[in-house]
Regions:
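Catalytic-site signature segments of enzymes, centered on catalytic residues
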Residues: 170, 185, 249-331, 356-370
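Catalytic loop of the DD-peptidase/beta-lactamase superfamily, centered on the K-T-G motif
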Residues: 21-26, 30-33, 92-169, 298-311, ...
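Active-site helix/loop module of the DD-peptidase/beta-lactamase fold
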Residues: 189-193, 205-246, 250, 272, ...
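The feature captures the short pre-catalytic strand/loop hairpin that immediately precedes
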Residues: 137, 264-276, 340-354
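Short solvent-exposed beta->alpha transition segments
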Residues: 31, 35, 40-90
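Short active-site loop at a secondary-structure junction
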Residues: 148-156, 178-237, 277-288, 357-360, ...
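Positively charged n-region of N-terminal signal peptides that target proteins for export
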Residues: 1-5
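Bacterial N-terminal signal peptides
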Residues: 7-15
Length: 462
């Protein structure tokens, strides 16, 4: 499931053309970057449109304003680099702790630039102070209650230590039209959290000797319609978002939505796209890569993807309210999805897949995800060595393991996943050194729930 707007450790690219007649100033790239940040922080549509017109950018001031609403503006923490052709600033949104690097690059004559945002570890001097647990959880509840009072969130939130729940919160409406409130056991859509289940399944099959992470993907998919586009792509690269393969959203997906019912159905629509860079050479989030992993699981196990994860993950962990049933099925209590349109919540159905996939879109509860976290910690699902590899940095910029987002070192280690889409915000974290599991699920747009989960994760005592 695609990450909506900004989600931890995702990459947002915004390209523009700059036309500069004067010779490049020593800090020309930094000047351009700071000019955009100033206009962005002011949330002034006319100023943003004027800036975009001046620098020949595509006219998307509305996109700027939506990102501004998500972040509350950007605070510049430090300058990492400033040359005529490149500037890099460490910034932090005012609404959350998600430190980011924003990089601007210009060509030799200053005619083109790319603004790139990516997640970054904060230096110690910029990290929030740790809090005593009771005070921290009280603050988290207050934040959730405040968001609920302004109708900015609806969902469930859970903090557990060594399997014991320390805090549980739920609020808002699961179904606004029928006035059904959210309950502690309400299932919510998971967006990209399903990638963790897919990765666990692949690693289980590796432990059984049925595959190797360095296997060519094509070895397990002999019927793939465009094998030339899998040349050089390995299972490891799919797991780490380094394959160069692309997404499963956009016009092609919309035009074929009615035919995308099985994982192999996605082949017919997306197999014609070759990797956009040599496999293994870069990082780029790839939902299609996890679709392919799902079909590999089917080929190797002899089961459907859905039957495999149900038998070998959900049942083993005791997850009785987790699945990916088709949207036409009745899932008791499943929260409806709502997206913001003209400042009001509106039912979201257009972006939902026919059913959840190995890339995302299934559903679960905070209680089931706690069980998943405990099954990981206790070794029920993976051996200690497999779990350690899956939850350690495995890609170039060290933000992803095998199907798990990762950050921090030592006592500050965190692994899990975030997911966001229209009408869905899901976050699952394990802090292994503290034996803590954090879960937040919401049926409204990101990132209100995710921000609270990160607020707690970044302040728990070590």
């Amino acid at each position: 499931m695609r990450l909506f707007r900004w989600v931890m450790l995702s990459v947002l690219l915004v390209s523009m053309a700059l036309h500069a007649k004067a010779p490049a100033a020593p800090d020309q790239a930094e000047q351009a970057l700071r000019a955009w940040i100033n206009a962005f922080n002011d949330a002034d549509r006319e100023a943003l449109m004027a800036f975009r017109a001046r620098y020949k950018m595509r006219p998307d001031a509305q996109g700027d304003l939506e990102f501004r609403a998500d972040t509350g503006g950007l605070q510049v923490l430090e300058i990492r680099e400033s040359t005529p052709g490149r500037a890099q600033l460490l910034v932090q949104p005012r609404s959350n702790d998600r430190t980011m690097l924003v990089t601007t690059t210009l060509d030799p004559v200053g005619h083109a630039a790319t603004f790139q945002f990516e997640g970054a570890e904060a230096p110690d001097r910029f990290k929030p102070k740790r809090m005593e647990t009771t005070a921290l959880l009280a603050e988290a509840k207050q934040r959730l209650d405040t968001l609920l009072a302004s109708d900015a969130v609806a969902g469930t939130f859970l903090v557990a230590k060594a399997g014991e729940v320390q805090m549980a919160w739920h609020g808002g409406m699961a179904d606004r039209e029928s006035v059904v409130p959210v309950g502690v056991d309400t299932p919510f859509r998971l967006a990209s959290l399903n990638k963790m289940f897919t990765a666990v399944a692949i690693l289980q099959l590796q432990e059984k000797g049925k595959l190797s992470l360095d296997d060519p993907v094509a070895q397990h998919l002999p019927d793939y319609p465009a094998p030339q586009n899998l040349r050089g792509v390995t299972l490891r690269q799919l797991l780490t978002h380094t394959s160069g393969l692309g997404d499963i959203f956009g016009e092609k997906a919309d035009a074929n939505a009615g035919s995308l019912k099985t994982l192999q159905d996605y082949w017919a629509v997306f197999s014609d796209a070759a990797p956009v860079f040599p496999p293994g050479s870069k990082d780029q989030y790839s939902n299609y890569g996890f679709i392919l992993l799902g079909t590999v699981i089917e080929a190797v196990s002899g089961q459907s993807y859905y039957d495999y994860v149900d038998a070998h993950i959900y049942r083993v962990a005791g997850m009785t309210a987790t699945g990916s049933a088709p949207e036409s099925s009745h899932v008791p209590g499943l929260a409806k999805a709502y997206t913001r349109v003209d400042h009001r919540w509106q039912r979201e159905t257009r972006s939902l897949p026919w059913r959840g996939t190995s890339a995302g879109g299934g559903y679960s509860t905070v209680g089931d995800l706690l069980k998943f976290g405990e099954a990981l910690r206790s070794g029920k699902l993976l051996s200690p060595s497999s779990l350690a590899a899956a939850t350690s940095p495995q890609n170039h910029k060290a933000w992803y393991g095998y199907g798990f987002m990762v950050r921090g070192q030592g006592k500050e280690r965190v692994y899990g996943h975030e997911g966001g889409a229209l009408g869905a915000n899901a976050v699952f974290y394990v802090l292994p050194e503290q034996a803590v599991v954090l879960v937040g699920l919401a049926n409204v747009d990101p990132d209100a729930m995710g921000n609270v989960v990160n607020f707690v994760a970044n302040r728990l005592p070590l």
